[in-house]
A protein has these predicted regions:
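Intrinsically disordered low-complexity regions specifically enriched for long asparagine
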Residues: 1-4, 26-28
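Residue-level detector of alpha-helix boundary/anchor positions
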Residues: 5, 21, 142-145
Length: 157
């Protein structure tokens, strides 16, 4: 075991420290970029909701609350699982990562107790869905073009 450790140290000694630091820094930047994607929650312009608590948004997307106060059935729409905006939204709103939420839905599907929100592949697709669906709620990157048929909901702590 000691011989393996000495060999490893000898090999690592040959790797320039600057290269090692560069690799670590690059990995850190990639993770920081994934977390730094800002988003906004949107609803159809006909929806009277102007603000929601973070926990309420989570309950809507996890389908723990299935109706708006008007009685209309909530139609949440997610982004693709691998999208940076979904990672940011999931971490901020659900306080979990995408894989944990995927596990939540797999359990509900397996037990016949629910199905996940529909997924769209881009901000434009989410905006289009919310624009034509009065009871929809979605999220898009903060730079997405919204148009007049959707509006942003303020998220409260």
């Amino acid at each position: 075991m000691a011989a393996v450790a000495r060999t490893l140290l000898r090999l690592l000694g040959r790797v320039p420290i600057a290269l090692l630091l560069l690799v670590v820094a690059a990995a850190g930047c990639r993770d920081a970029d994934a977390q730094a994607v800002s988003y906004r929650v949107i609803v159809n312009a006909q929806n009277p909701v102007a603000q929601l608590k973070r926990d309420d948004v989570s309950r809507l997307f996890l389908k723990k609350v299935v109706n708006w106060k008007t009685g209309a059935e909530v139609q949440p729409v997610d982004q693709a699982q691998d999208s940076p905006v979904r990672r940011s939204f999931t971490k901020d709103i659900h306080k979990k990562d995408v894989e944990q939420i995927k596990g939540y839905w797999q359990q509900l599907i397996f037990t016949g107790q629910g199905a996940p929100p529909i997924e769209k592949g881009s901000d434009d697709e989410v905006v289009a869905f919310v624009a034509k669906t009065p009871a929809a709620i979605g999220y898009v990157s903060s730079t997405a073009a919204l148009g007049s048929a959707v509006r942003t909901v303020q998220i409260l702590p």
